[in-house]
Amino acid sequence: MRSKAELFVMGLTPVDERKMPFGGCLWYANEHCDAYEKRIEEACINQNVPFLPTFKEMNSDSRSINWLSNDGIHLNASGHLYIYQRLRSWEALQKWRFN
């Protein structure tokens, strides 16, 4: 059975490990974000689902720490702007929008 909905998947964003543990009990590590994003990408490839990797590019950008909210996990307005700009130029999304 084929789905009638289009599906696109975006990767993960880095965290500020200095802010851990989040909520006093949860530890998030960039090493784990990287590994998990690779698994998500593999699953998308296996299912022929467009995947936009984000973790490595964001994590390697020295500005990325400024794209996180004070909790060190969630994106702030600047982080969401970065994602928006990536999505606007993503070829898979452009093909879908104009077909």
Label the predicted regions:
Residues 55-56, 78:
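A general structural signal for short secondary-structure boundary/capping elements
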Residues 38, 47-50, 69-99:
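Histidine-centered active-site loop/cap adjacent to the catalytic His
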Residues 17-54:
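Substrate-gating cap/lid alpha-helix
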Residues 16-20, 59-65:
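Short acidic/His/Gly/Ser-rich catalytic and metal-binding motifs that mark active-site loops
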Residues 10-11:
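Alpha/beta-hydrolase-fold catalytic nucleophile elbow
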Residues 23-24, 66-69:
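Short low-complexity, flexible loop/linker segments enriched in glycine and/or proline
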Residues 1-7, 49:
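A short helix->loop->beta-strand "cap" motif at the edges of active sites that frequently abuts
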